[in-house]
Amino acid sequence: MKKYTYVPGSFIAAWLIWELIVRLGGFNEALFPTPYKVLLGFGELIGDGVLFKDIADSLVRFFIGYIISVVAGVFFGLILGWYKGIWNYINPIVQVIRPISPVAWLPFIVLFFGIGQTPAIVIIFIAAFFPVLLSTVSAIQNIDPVYIKVARNFGIKQPELLFKIVLPAVFPGIASGLHIALGTAWIFLVTGEMVGSQTGLGFLIIDMRNNLRNDLLMVAILTIGFVGLLLDWGVSLIEKWIYKRWGIEK
């Protein structure tokens, strides 16, 4: 809890620095709004119901894409990590595709899925899939073989071996991939919404920019940061619950 005592102070310091930059820099507040104007902007968008609706729309797209990517990434990661011969053939292809930005696939995504919320979901899936896949494969390949030998000596077979021995042993490695995937998926969700959606926080940024409402533009930007922080915090809570349930010390 001690680390949270610094949070109010850090936000107050950021507020003051922001205010000083605007005042001393002589910026036009219509172009670079003060913190107070942004605070009023929060009130305006909350009062209109726009902010919460866009947050909800973004979260729906995010969770659909993220959950599908986690399930697929862990599933294929377990298989490819367990069968190293198959992974040796798949790995070069993965290493070529993995560095490509999900946005680069957008013309083909639109071609196959059309315009709307589906392209954003597909972009989220691509962004989150590879961190989860690679962390799962790495965790499986680095599992201590003693765990498997002892389990087999006690007569433990599949699927009990998977759920009681393998998954608890590799979960810390998978968890790191889940955190990386969360961040990249949230970033690219906003990018996807900027291109093809008519709702969501990414669309809100484009809409406010086109309407020259930089105060509301800043509201959307800050909201993306705060929601991303809450999502990461939520994943951490789930992670701790799983650690506790499986009796894993972190």
Q: Model-predicted segments: where are they?
A:
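Periplasmic/extracellular loop-to-transmembrane helix junction in inner-membrane transport proteins
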Residues: L24-I67
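Faces of alpha-helical transmembrane segments in polytopic inner-membrane proteins
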Residues: A72, F76, I97-P102, I123-V137, ...
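Cytoplasmic-entry segments and transmembrane alpha-helices of multi-pass inner-membrane transporters
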Residues: F75-V110, L134-I143, K149
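Glycine-rich helix-loop "coupling/hinge" segments at transmembrane-helix boundaries
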Residues: V110-L111, I187-I224, Y243, I248-K250
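Transmembrane alpha-helices
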Residues: V122, I126, Q158-T191
